[in-house]
């Protein structure tokens, strides 16, 4: 492992807790280990699985889904979304202070890397269950560590350890986010907006957007002062290869056979106009603070 990535794991380890006994851990000699002797090996690809058992991550996105995501994101199609998240993170950061950026269900670390590019004093941890994703997340950024853990369950982090928590298109446990978020820390959540991929839902049989998603977020995180809501909206022109990757990297891939997807994509024009509509919500943890009115902005991006 390169020295800078070794240092990233050492820095992040100070915020970690053993998933078995909840004790502090140290990184060294190719493993993460607590005082009671519970140890978790550093995989050859550079990530550490901190599930409660000794085995590595066994669920999460498949290797095919991760490869499709890497190709699609690598082509820059969602770069405006990543840039918007990074800009919001920069606004919420407090005067260049160091701290931990925790990316829950962070996949390949794509969004975490963009945030760390602008928060140059901070280190990051990408948490995911997919071994295929973690292999890539381990190389996503010199100041990021990749950790195998379940975002739905108790996280292997100390109380109040995260200066910033990211949840981008993934599952989240509100109680655990509250536990690990530091006083004065910030939370950024990105979810699909109502028009996201609307041109593809019928022709390709994609999973629909939950109409109650915004209401559920308000219920789950209503105790935080609202720092803002940004709607990132733009259109892409996607050829059939990119279109296939877009579907193959997301949850609809679990419900559409590869052959059926190929047939449906082949029936569409080439290229296809696709709407990107992403709602980015940001919150700050201020114990005892009064609720504030939510500031709303719409970011239109020409592509």
Model region roles, listed by residue range:
Residues 1-59:
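N-terminal auxiliary segments of SAM/dcSAM-dependent transferases
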Residues 12-14, 231-303:
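Conserved Class I S-adenosyl-L-methionine
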Residues 58-83:
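Class I SAM-dependent methyltransferase Rossmann-like catalytic core
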Residues 100-102, 109-154:
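Class I SAM-dependent methyltransferase SAM/SAH-binding core
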Residues 186-216:
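Conserved class I S-adenosyl-L-methionine
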């Amino acid at each position: 492992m390169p020295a800078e990535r070794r240092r990233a794991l050492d820095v992040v380890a100070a915020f970690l807790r053993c998933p078995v006994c909840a004790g502090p851990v140290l990184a060294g000699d190719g493993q993460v280990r607590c005082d009671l002797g519970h140890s978790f090996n550093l995989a050859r690809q550079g990530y550490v699985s901190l599930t409660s058992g000794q085995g590595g991550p066994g669920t999460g996105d498949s290797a095919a889904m991760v490869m499709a995501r890497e190709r699609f994101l690598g082509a820059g199609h969602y770069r405006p979304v990543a840039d918007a998240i990074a800009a919001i993170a920069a606004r919420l950061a407090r005067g260049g202070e160091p701290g931990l950026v925790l990316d829950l269900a962070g996949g390949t670390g794509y969004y975490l890397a963009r945030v760390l590019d602008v928060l140059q004093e901070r280190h990051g941890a990408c948490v995911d269950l997919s071994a295929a994703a973690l292999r890539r997340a381990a190389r996503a950024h010199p100041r990021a560590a990749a950790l195998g853990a379940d975002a739905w369950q108790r996280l292997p982090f100390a109380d109040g350890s995260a200066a910033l928590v990211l949840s981008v298109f993934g599952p989240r446990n509100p109680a655990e986010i509250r536990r690990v978020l530091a006083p004065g820390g910030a939370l950024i959540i990105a979810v699909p907006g109502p028009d996201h991929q609307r041109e593809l839902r019928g022709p390709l049989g994609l999973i629909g957007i939950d109409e109650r998603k915004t209401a559920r977020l308000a219920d789950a995180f209503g105790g935080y002062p609202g720092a803002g809501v940004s709607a990132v909206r733009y259109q892409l022109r996607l050829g059939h290869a990119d279109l296939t990757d877009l579907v193959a990297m997301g949850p609809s891939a679990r419900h559409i056979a590869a052959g059926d997807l190929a047939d449906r994509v082949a029936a569409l024009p080439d290229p296809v106009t696709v709407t990107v509509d992403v709602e980015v919500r940001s919150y700050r943890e201020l114990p005892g603070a009064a609720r504030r009115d939510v500031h709303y902005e719409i970011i239109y991006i020409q592509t």
